[in-house]
């Protein structure tokens, strides 16, 4: 598969015609429009969550954003093939950025001890960003984001298929 995968920050601005950077993302995407542009189910969930908790956004604007979301047809779900790139990214992030006192602690054999409780704050990466990046790697898509995602990009260079990022501003 080829094309682009929109990160939450890109999709939310694309679907909000009143956002000050809406025109910028539209122009950016028009310049790459010969390739398919995909969206992750995680991005849809993050935006819907945001709409539900932001009380200052008027109902009409929320409806406009939801209508734009509904028009987007190229949606990627998580599946068993997302597991490998996700776990590879998360493991590399853990090895590189977890606090030293956490790195040697997973030596027991009880299943409940194998669950990693290292937080996004400790790794410097949001959990959903790892999932979205994993989908981009899984499908060989270029991730369109406003974030640098420097830690994810850095550790992905050790993987068979590193993350490709197209940053827009």
Predicted regions and their residues:
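Active-site neighborhoods of divalent-metal-dependent phosphate/nucleic-acid chemistry enzymes
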Residues: 49, 74-146
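Short, mixed-charge aromatic SLiMs
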Residues: 70-74, 159
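Short, hinge-like loop/turn segments at secondary-structure boundaries
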Residues: 55-58, 93, 161-164
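Alpha-helix capping/helix-boundary segments
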Residues: 10, 43, 82, 131-132, ...
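Acidic, PIN/NYN-like endoribonuclease modules and their adjacent C-terminal/linker elements
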Residues: 3, 121-122, 133-169
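General small-molecule cofactor/ligand-binding pocket signal
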Residues: 38, 76, 166
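Short, well-structured N-terminal submotif of metal-dependent ribonuclease cores
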Residues: 1-70
């Amino acid at each position: 598969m080829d094309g682009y995968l929109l990160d939450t920050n890109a999709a939310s601005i694309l679907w909000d015609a009143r956002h000050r950077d809406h025109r910028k993302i539209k122009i950016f995407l028009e310049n790459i429009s010969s390739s398919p542009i995909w969206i992750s189910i995680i991005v849809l969930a993050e935006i819907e969550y945001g709409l539900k908790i932001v009380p200052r956004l008027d109902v009409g604007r929320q409806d406009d954003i939801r209508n734009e979301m509904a028009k987007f047809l190229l949606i990627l779900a998580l599946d068993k093939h997302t597991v490998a790139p996700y776990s590879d990214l998360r493991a590399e992030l853990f090895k590189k950025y977890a606090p030293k006192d956490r790195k040697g602690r997973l030596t027991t054999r009880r299943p409940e001890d194998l669950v990693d409780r290292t937080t996004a704050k400790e790794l410097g990466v949001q959990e959903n960003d790892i999932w979205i990046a994993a989908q981009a790697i899984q499908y060989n898509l270029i991730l369109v984001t406003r974030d640098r995602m420097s830690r994810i990009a850095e550790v992905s260079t050790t993987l068979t298929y590193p993350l490709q990022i197209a940053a827009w501003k």
